[in-house]
Amino acid sequence: MGAIAAGIAMAGAAIGGGVGDGIVISKMLEGMARQPELSGQLRTNMFIGVGLVEAMPIIAFVVALMVMNK
């Protein structure tokens, strides 16, 4: 049962991370199209946002390992 729960947790986190990355990057590209002079600042903020979004699957992986090792 723990393996099923771990698999579901990882699948949800991977889907959420992919969707979140797509949203962050698309909004950054929209901002760059509107104001090209801010592209450097937008790129920096995009990398921070992607890093925060990608933390979710990493945390889910650690939790999945903890659930499977119980």
From Swiss-Prot:
<dbReference type="GO" id="GO:0033177">
    <property type="term" value="C:proton-transporting two-sector ATPase complex, proton-transporting domain"/>
</dbReference>
<dbReference type="InterPro" id="IPR020537">
    <property type="entry name" value="ATP_synth_F0_csu_DDCD_BS"/>
</dbReference>
<feature type="transmembrane region" description="Helical">
    <location>
        <begin position="4"/>
        <end position="24"/>
    </location>
</feature>
<keyword id="KW-0406">Ion transport</keyword>
<dbReference type="GO" id="GO:0045259">
    <property type="term" value="C:proton-transporting ATP synthase complex"/>
</dbReference>
<dbReference type="InterPro" id="IPR000454">
    <property type="entry name" value="ATP_synth_F0_csu"/>
</dbReference>
<dbReference type="GO" id="GO:0005886">
    <property type="term" value="C:plasma membrane"/>
</dbReference>
<keyword id="KW-0472">Membrane</keyword>
<keyword id="KW-0446">Lipid-binding</keyword>
<keyword id="KW-1003">Cell membrane</keyword>
<dbReference type="InterPro" id="IPR005953">
    <property type="entry name" value="ATP_synth_csu_bac/chlpt"/>
</dbReference>
<comment type="subunit">
    <text>F-type ATPases have 2 components, F(1) - the catalytic core - and F(0) - the membrane proton channel. F(1) has five subunits: alpha(3), beta(3), gamma(1), delta(1), epsilon(1). F(0) has three main subunits: a(1), b(2) and c(10-14). The alpha and beta chains form an alternating ring which encloses part of the gamma chain. F(1) is attached to F(0) by a central stalk formed by the gamma and epsilon chains, while a peripheral stalk is formed by the delta and b chains.</text>
</comment>
<comment type="function">
    <text>F(1)F(0) ATP synthase produces ATP from ADP in the presence of a proton or sodium gradient. F-type ATPases consist of two structural domains, F(1) containing the extramembraneous catalytic core and F(0) containing the membrane proton channel, linked together by a central stalk and a peripheral stalk. During catalysis, ATP synthesis in the catalytic domain of F(1) is coupled via a rotary mechanism of the central stalk subunits to proton translocation.</text>
</comment>
<dbReference type="GO" id="GO:0008289">
    <property type="term" value="F:lipid binding"/>
</dbReference>
<dbReference type="Pfam" id="PF00137">
    <property type="entry name" value="ATP-synt_C"/>
</dbReference>
<dbReference type="InterPro" id="IPR035921">
    <property type="entry name" value="F/V-ATP_Csub_sf"/>
</dbReference>
<keyword id="KW-0812">Transmembrane</keyword>
<comment type="function">
    <text>Key component of the F(0) channel; it plays a direct role in translocation across the membrane. A homomeric c-ring of between 10-14 subunits forms the central stalk rotor element with the F(1) delta and epsilon subunits.</text>
</comment>
<keyword id="KW-0138">CF(0)</keyword>
<comment type="similarity">
    <text>Belongs to the ATPase C chain family.</text>
</comment>
<dbReference type="InterPro" id="IPR038662">
    <property type="entry name" value="ATP_synth_F0_csu_sf"/>
</dbReference>
<dbReference type="GO" id="GO:0046933">
    <property type="term" value="F:proton-transporting ATP synthase activity, rotational mechanism"/>
</dbReference>
<keyword id="KW-0813">Transport</keyword>
<keyword id="KW-1133">Transmembrane helix</keyword>
<keyword id="KW-0066">ATP synthesis</keyword>
<keyword id="KW-0375">Hydrogen ion transport</keyword>
<protein>
    <recommendedName>
        <fullName>ATP synthase subunit c</fullName>
    </recommendedName>
</protein>
<feature type="site" description="Reversibly protonated during proton transport">
    <location>
        <position position="54"/>
    </location>
</feature>
<feature type="transmembrane region" description="Helical">
    <location>
        <begin position="47"/>
        <end position="67"/>
    </location>
</feature>
<dbReference type="InterPro" id="IPR002379">
    <property type="entry name" value="ATPase_proteolipid_c-like_dom"/>
</dbReference>
